[in-house]
Curated annotation (Swiss-Prot):
Pfam families: Kazal_1 (PF00050). Residues 4-54 form the Kazal-like domain. The record marks 16-17 as: Reactive bond 3. Keywords: Disulfide bond, Glycoprotein, Protease inhibitor, Repeat, Secreted, Serine protease inhibitor. It comes from Cereopsis novaehollandiae. Avian ovomucoid consists of three homologous, tandem Kazal family inhibitory domains. Glycans are attached at residue 43. This is Ovomucoid. Disulfide bonds join 6-36, 14-33, 22-54. InterPro entries: Bifunctional_prot_inhibitor (IPR051597), Kazal_dom (IPR002350), Kazal_dom_sf (IPR036058), Prot_inh_Kazal-m (IPR001239). Its main location: secreted. It is found in: Secreted. One of its GO terms (cellular component) is extracellular region. It comes from the Eukaryota.
Length: 54
């Protein structure tokens, strides 16, 4: 099972680095920062499906 540590999020701004992650909502997030901010916004209901594009 793929996991990402989002304990130091949310962050006010994310860098533009591109390292895609696929969320449990079947949406591709551009990088860990964007994904983790979305996890926080979802109150933890969003999880990582896998690394890479959906």
């Amino acid at each position: 099972v793929a996991t990402v540590d989002c304990s130091d999020y949310p962050k006010p701004a994310c860098r533009m680095e591109y390292m895609p992650l696929c969320g449990s909502d079947n949406k591709t997030y551009g990088n860990k920062c964007n994904f983790c901010n979305a996890v926080v916004d979802s109150n933890g209901t969003l999880t990582l499906s896998h690394f890479g594009k959906c």
